[in-house]
């Protein structure tokens, strides 16, 4: 408890902007005000009074590598607090969530969206998405906010996707990238698997510098590593937010095999708590029991908090 909050605190109030840079969401528009589009005062603040404008902390748009021709407009709300998450965060979460839902709703008819569409001209569909960052820097905070609010009942009508990002998930991605950079061996890019909706050979790419929004609060992040000294030497890295156990390791080996079919190099699976002395035999047994023995031979296990933990 609090481990992730301590790391978030090291970045301070600019943590969200720093994070966006790490995941390739560079040069986002900041501090945008848009008009509320509701004529009957449906959108209200927490005091129940009608609002006339909405604030967007960050706005980032990109063409999706997972869905052919889709322009993703990411409307970001950043809530950085010096207090820990409340013991009962549901009420405050609903306030933040509903505010973002209303903002995404009004963005659809805003002048700001028209400006975005003028810049991006090669798309066939548009997807407006909300991302709520709720972060704090208190070491005694329960970092796993998402699991606490997972069953929160939100009485609001919406037809857009909203992603929630907490301390745990931000620090997870920071840690993965810090680990890779500390190795001083690879150029990294995020891996884009085949989804059945990104099949156009003209636009299809299997990796890039932009983390798809669909992964932003994922418990697993796939990354392509290219050797600095030999670009033809490619390693497939899978980072897990959850701790090591035999079942998780087996599952991630299967996932890595399915995703990396056209890659020929090493496969690395990273956990936050892997310990060679404690887990080596468990990892060996799992690899022995994996259906594809040849593939299992290419797999190594690391603790991405420790560069010396390669198995």
Sequence positions of predicted segments:
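Intrinsically disordered, low-complexity Ser/Thr/Pro/Gly-rich regulatory segments
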Residues: 1-55, 60-311
